[in-house]
Swiss-Prot record:
Gene Ontology MF term list: aminoacyl-tRNA deacylase activity; ATP binding; isoleucine-tRNA ligase activity; tRNA binding; zinc ion binding
HAMAP family: Ile_tRNA_synth_type2
Organism: Wolbachia pipientis wMel
Cofactor dependence: Zn(2+)
Entry EC no(s): 6.1.1.5
A biological process from GO: isoleucyl-tRNA aminoacylation
Pfam families xrefs: Anticodon_1, DUF5915, tRNA-synt_1
GO cellular component terms, semicolon-separated: cytoplasm
Catalytic activity line of the entry: tRNA(Ile) + L-isoleucine + ATP = L-isoleucyl-tRNA(Ile) + AMP + diphosphate
Motif ('HIGH' region): 52-62
Reported function: Catalyzes the attachment of isoleucine to tRNA(Ile). As IleRS can inadvertently accommodate and process structurally similar amino acids such as valine, to avoid such errors it has two additional distinct tRNA(Ile)-dependent editing activities. One activity is designated as 'pretransfer' editing and involves the hydrolysis of activated Val-AMP. The other activity is designated 'posttransfer' editing and involves deacylation of mischarged Val-tRNA(Ile).
Record protein name field: Isoleucine--tRNA ligase
Amino acid sequence: MKSKHYPDTVSSPDFLSLEKEIIKFWQENKVFERSVEERSKDNCFVFYDGPPFANGLPHYGHLLTGFIKDAFARYQTMLQKRVERRFGWDCHGLPAEMGAEKELGISGRTEIEKFGIDKFNDHCRTSVMKFSSEWEKYVNRQARWVDFHNDYKTMDKSFMESVMWAFKQLYDKGLVYESVRVVPYSWACETPLSNFETRLDNAYREKVSKAVTVAFELLENPQQFKSVKRKCKLLAWTTTPWTLPSNLALAIGKDIKYCAVSVHPLMSFQRVTLESISGSQCLGTGMTGSSEGSSMNGEIYIFAESYLEKFISHSEQNNIPYENCNIKLKANDLAGLSYKPLFDYFKDTKNAFRVFIADYVTEEDGTGVVHTAPGFGEEDFYLCQSHDIPVICPIDNSGKFTAEVSDLAGVHVFDANDTVIKKLKGQGSWFKTEQYIHNYPHCWRTDTPLIYRTMPSWYVAVTKFKSRMVELNKRVNWIPNHIRDGQFGKWLEGAHDWSISRNRFWGTPIPVWKSDDARYPRVDVYGSIEELERDFNVKIDDLHRPFIDTLTRLNPDDPTGKSVMRRVPDVFDCWFESGSMPFAQIHYPFENKEWFESADFITEYIAQTRGWFYTLFVLSTALFNREPFKNCICHGVVLDVKGQKLSKRLNNYADPMEVFDRYGSDALRFLMLSGSIICGGNLLLDKEGNSIRDVLKNVIKPIWNSYHFFTMYANADGIKAEVCKDYQSTIDRYMISKCFEAVESIQASMNSYSSQEACKILIDFFEVLNNWYIRRSRERFWKSDLDQDKTDAYNVLYTVFYYILRAAAPLLPLITENIWQGLKYEETSVHLANFPQLEKFDSQLIAKMDLVREVCNSALSIRNTFNIRIRQPLGSMIIYHQSSCSFLEGEPLSVIPEFFPVIQVADTGIQCAADSNEYQEMIKDEVNVKSLELVNRLEGIASLELKLNFPLLGKRIPDKIKKLVQYVKEGKWKQVENEQIFLGDESENYIIEKGEYELLLKANSEYSSVFDNNKGIVILNTELNDELILEGLARDVVRLIQETRKQADFHISDRIRVIIKTEEEKIKEAINTWFEYIKEQTLALSLDINTEIGTNFYSKEYQDLSVSIER
């Protein structure tokens, strides 16, 4: 009995079991650990793994990011780089606190403080790692290699100390400051947010607001109305009526033209236009017809001219009498005027209630007059600050009015709009209310609308070094590359100072201590635990609140010895912590000072251009004056088939673990790595997983089939194959060259961070291996003698696997590992092997054979179109190309002047000599035709059609298009020199340049197909005679015998006895005519027709015949 050197494989394995076996093998043999430790520390590839939160299960976005990270980390490992993959956990911040509040059944600052900050933070510490073990299961099952045992957590004391160090460094460089400014504020979380947090996923969404137009009564009229004893009012528009109680100023535009309209609610009214009325009409004594006390009694409204049309429309719809004063005012006519406060809450505010010119006022929305509340708008804040108007912000941390607004105290701002509008109506200040739909920022954690309010906060002075960030960004290789100067580059150019403090509980504390007595000011900033222990004389085991808040000491600058240094109550924005990850994860600079480097590669979802990528860039530039990473993939989003986000509410996705158990990890990995989602596009994933199943069927199964074919026949022959690169056979040399070309192309793609292209190359390669090399070499494997030719065929497959499995390993780590181990190569694991070194290959041979394959595919597509089975031989085929013998007969290509030289089978420079007949035989055998005819003239078989590029020609000669179309229809065109087209006749003609036209090949026969980008045509002769019919039937009989062998579970090498039972005379004739052929193809010892069937025979019925076999 022949020895078996390879595993017995089955054609349809349980891929799920195979994957689990490989994962178990990796874990038991510590393959991942070895892949790191066996690489030199002097040859590192630095990879940053952005930390996720562990208070929720992984979703498809996490899996996608993980697949990308793992693929390129594995690839670099195979390039002999040391790639450490330390996993990290984001532990602090709003996600953790919101989760803890929900679990504890409490909400808001007051309830947390009542519950106890110590107990609350203890709960956060536990709950934030709630799903860490589940995460490990998911990550391991997706075949991603990471170091969980040496993980880092942003709540670790060592990590937090490095964050404190970073803050101290920035402070010492003058890049950190404290200030009261208007910031985005989440009243639901009771904390400010940074400006980039308002640009995260769907932070801006549609919101319907009540916009109100309000009349502000001037205490002194503009110069144009000094002599008029009527009230002048400025109309201002706002989408936040709840901010009106805090109004302290009005802003107008420097270059805006303003107009005045008189409103007379009780007088008889005649509508007039701006052009038809004179100024005297408006100012005349007849304009005082309304009774005293009316809210609109002869009042003059002033607003931007651009608002006049809207004003008139509203007035007419609501029967409000009005007249245009036909007086134009400039900003300077209004600037400096004082006006009556809408409400009395802050009527005594210093320098307030005046009109100011501001650059930001436009006419796009509203009235050209902007209501200004410095406590609730950034531009408002700076305008009032420049005029020494104090800031008023009468709301508490939960977004409710304080006692300063007495009749609204305790009312949430968004619930106060109707009350404010009612009060405005009651006092005659209201003009109109409208529904206004606009995009409005929402909290990224609670989905509640944000407000803008003044808050004290610590800031990183990003504006001081943002130009340097723009410079450093030019060094980064972004995928897709438009991110560099587009989404990310533009964001850097418009960067603001970054608010990094949060008035929350669970986070790294801001390491600032201040004197509690303003008479003896002092600020201490700490950058290490050692400094804290030195000054406060205490051993520090935990840096979290509330312990850190208990550290106090006497103010050294206070001679009275009474004031105390106390820590500011804020903690860091968790984005500051994640931006510190590159150095904080290794406790830099307290440890590993020599190790810290910029990342060679990172990847995350594209929105991180305004999140993690940005914070990394800010801190790396400010602290180290260098870019934080060199290569960055910004991937897209996984959506459902309707383009909706995957969500539990919509129930539009399957649990990833269910997908792994149904289709395996490799299939999902390959689907994601091969799609446009890698370069910023989106992936539509159906809940049933059909697209994943297709990968299993069309990618992984073909790879397995080639391996199964090898082991099945190699074990049958008892051969132990070898890696060998030199062969005599054309098809062997082609397959080896094709493999080396694929390996080189995959490496180039992976070097360019294009897994999408690498996956395409892999698919194309296995198409060639299965459907060209193996299929064309079947008879070599089937023959009984183990000669050199057969040995070469085994060695080719074994060699091809040796190279391509290593190239494919980062993309399909599980199936490649299984096959690698089955083929028993030297290295224990394919992932411990090095990526294949580039080998020389015969590019001309590849070009020839690829075109042969293309000719065959074109011919086979004709058969498929007309349902002509491949087993049915045809009489002949015609191949048209430029030269009669250049491609298959070995002569160099040459242009025949009489013919248009665009139709060709091979590119110029490809020559065939001794091997030409072999190519012809391949084509005839593959297409199953008896003869092949090469022609170099179109006459009788095809014609050329001219197709004009109208978009291009329309720009050059737009008035001649109709004439050109006419000449084309009349066939008045020919090719001239330099690939130009002469179109027309002697009286009128035009030269059509290359690119302005396309020549299409159209065959006379319907049994035809073009190939090689319209450079050649194949025509099949489909007429059948008796001889061809009989041969086709004989081939069908062979197929049915082989199918019966498979059904009987006979081995491929088993010799068999065959009995055919049929009443069809044609089938009998075919068997008798092709008797020896059928026996040879089926390894039949005997072949009988309609004889007695013994008891040991296995029988199967088919249409028109039955097949019985015995071994």
